[in-house]
From Swiss-Prot:
This is Lysine--tRNA ligase. Mg(2+) 1 binds at residues 412, 419. It catalyses: tRNA(Lys) + L-lysine + ATP = L-lysyl-tRNA(Lys) + AMP + diphosphate. It comes from the Bacteria. Keywords: Aminoacyl-tRNA synthetase, ATP-binding, Cytoplasm, Ligase, Magnesium, Metal-binding, Nucleotide-binding, Protein biosynthesis. Transmembrane segments: none annotated. Homodimer. It comes from Parabacteroides distasonis (strain ATCC 8503 / DSM 20701 / CIP 104284 / JCM 5825 / NCTC 11152). GO terms for molecular function: ATP binding; lysine-tRNA ligase activity; magnesium ion binding; tRNA binding. Binds 3 Mg(2+) ions per subunit. One of its GO terms (cellular component) is cytosol. Pfam families: DUF4332, tRNA-synt_2, tRNA_anti-codon.
């Protein structure tokens, strides 16, 4: 990278890196640095009347207060921050004081990683700190961190632009308090869920991500191409059909926690790549699954928050079991006044028009009902509510209701106005399943690009016999949002999907050389703001010469300064 492409701070840090090497100090050492303590644990276990505890810690410098022969710095490790007291004569016990006077005071910067060996003590101001006796450079930071200042728990000069935070999550995690805690809670949520499923005796499995048929859900898939086989493949939209094959194969219960992909919109609650847990258990039904789910979520909430309640967007949500259960058609009648039971597709389409909804001819009966529920009902369910007994047209993989014709044994769990889970008494009648797939094919031919494909191998598996089974899918990302009080899905994804970062257009050196400009002057011209030769067209020759001369001197480029006449010739050549 050319020197002129760097900021002044970056240049200073690179110079410091080279000076460290000249002193025989490797700024990126390869050897293991052994630590025996962390900031949080040091503070929690400190006792004033105990013998001074020797510690070896490491972390990132987050602030410094440099004085004369003694200074302070704040070190951030994986658990938090701790103050370190640096005394010149303690870290430099002999005549050579360079470690303090040069390395610490001049060549180290905020953002650098160092190792400290010393002992724990309490300062006169009452702060538990580490008294350094040895300092080791572990990694030199070449870019300055944004400095976020905190006073009374309020951040100032914050690194808070959402796009920057999501693109540079590595910076966000370092400088913004509380961000890392979200992802530690995410890990705890998944760990608690996995532990509960393992304790229940269910087997964690892995199924294909690349699939020849995008089945298991109604969604638009991502398509890719396998060069060796010369076939199109789909990134899975769900794990359902493969997991049910394993139930056919004799597993009592199977689950998978993994990524699914849906080529659909992005908003505050949707990301095209998302994490889902799917579970299938033989000899169970959707009533059992509702009971299992509410107990599981209550356990997770207590494990993460210490209580069965979570707060999000000013609302307190109780995950204390049991949850309310409400049939979907009753929910629609309750919110819109329309009773859809027994209505035909044409009658429901007419109701949609009366409700002034935007619909189109590709939507079948199930899609129309789904649109009504989504627009008028879904957002009203704040406390956990099982919406149950969906019409068969909305549920191509679900068993028919045992006592309610035209309905299925399916539920969706609504929390804070969004779907968190989807579950069924699974359809295990292969003939019925084939008819449902054919109906989905009809919808696909009608133009519904979210209709399911016919999976002949899955039908073949069902024909060998699948026991009565209940299954559920829980959206992990939305669950983390609920448990951590976040209102956007991007806040619970370490690296959410984003548009490619815009790059500044720059002409290559050849275009400048064609104007008669020496190649060695190109970086200086671009540093001065002339990123393309076209930008030179209206330049003032005298002003440009002054800028180039200043850059030549400031950065010690040692170039022969151009004359005004030479620059005028460059500008004239742009128009030719």
């Amino acid at each position: 990278m050319n020197l002129l492409e760097l900021s002044e701070q970056e240049i200073i840090r690179r110079n410091s890196m080279e000076q460290l090497r000249q002193m025989g100090i490797e700024p990126y050492p390869a050897a293991e640095y052994v630590t025996n303590a962390f900031s949080k644990e040091i503070k929690e276990t400190f006792k004033d009347d105990a013998e001074p505890r020797p510690v070896s810690i490491a972390g990132r410098i987050m602030s410094r207060r440099i004085m004369g022969k003694a200074s302070f710095m704040e070190l951030q490790d994986s658990e938090g921050r701790i103050q370190v007291y640096i005394s010149r004569d303690d870290i430099c016990p002999d005549e050579n004081k360079d470690t303090y006077n040069v390395v610490f005071k001049k060549l180290l910067d905020i953002g650098d990683f160092v190792g400290i060996k010393g002992f724990v003590f309490r300062t006169q101001m009452g702060e538990i700190s580490v008294h350094a006796q040895e300092l080791t450079v572990l990694s030199k930071s070449l870019r300055p961190l944004p400095v976020v200042k905190y006073k009374d728990g309020v951040a100032y000069d914050g690194f808070n632009d959402p796009e920057l935070r999501y693109r540079q999550r590595y910076v966000d995690l370092v400088v913004n308090e509380g961000v890392k805690d979200i992802f530690m809670k995410r890990a705890a949520i998944i760990k608690t869920m996995r532990t509960a499923l393992d304790e229940a005796g269910y087997t964690e499995v892995e199924t294909p991500i690349l699939q020849s048929i995008a089945g298991g859900a109604s969604a638009r898939p991502f398509i890719t191409h396998h060069n060796s086989l010369d076939i199109d493949l789909y990134l899975r939209i769900a794990t359902e059909l493969y997991l049910k094959r394993l139930i056919v194969g004799g597993f009592e219960g199977v689950y998978e926690i993994g990524k699914n992909f849906r080529n659909e919109g992005m908003d505050r609650t949707h990301n095209p790549e998302f994490t889902c847990m799917e579970l299938y258990v033989q000899y169970k039904d959707y009533n059992w699954m509702m009971s299992f789910t509410e107990k599981l979520l209550e356990r997770i909430c207590i494990a993460v928050n210490g209580t069965s309640e979570s707060t999000i967007d000013g609302k307190t949500i109780s995950f204390k079991a049991p949850f309310r259960r409400l049939p979907i058609l009753e929910a629609i009648k309750e919110k819109t006044g329309y009773d859809l039971e027994g209505k035909t597709e044409d009658e429901i389409r007419a109701i949609c028009k009366e409700l002034k909804m935007e619909i189109d001819d590709t939507m079948g009966k199930g899609k129309l009902i789904d649109e009504i529920f989504g627009e008028f009902c879904e957002g009203t369910f704040i406390q956990p509510t099982f919406i149950i007994d969906y019409p068969v047209e909305m549920s191509p993989l679900t068993k028919m209701h045992r006592s309610k014709p035209g309905l299925t044994e399916r539920f969706e769990l609504m929390v804070n106005g969004k779907e968190l889970a989807n579950a069924y008494s699974e359809l295990n009648d292969p003939i019925d399943q084939e008819e449902r797939f054919k109906e989905q094919l009809r919808l696909s031919e009608k133009g519904d690009d979210e209709a399911m494909f016919i999976d002949q191998d899955f039908l073949r598996a069902l024909q060998f016999g699948m026991p009565p089974t209940s299954g559920i899918g829980i959206g992990i990302d939305r669950l983390v949002m609920l448990m951590t009080g976040q209102t956007t899905i991007q806040e619970v994804l370490l690296f959410p999907q984003m548009r490619p970062e815009k790059t500044v257009k720059k002409d290559n050196a050849d275009k400048y050389v064609a104007l008669g400009i020496s190649e060695e002057w190109v970086p200086a011209l671009q540093k001065a703001g002339y990123l393309t030769v076209e930008m030179l067209k209206n330049a003032n020759a005298n002003k440009l010469r002054q800028e180039l001369c200043e850059l030549n001197k400031k950065y010690k480029l040692e170039l022969q300064n151009p004359t005004v006449q030479e620059i005028e010739a460059w500008i004239a050549n742009v128009g030719e």
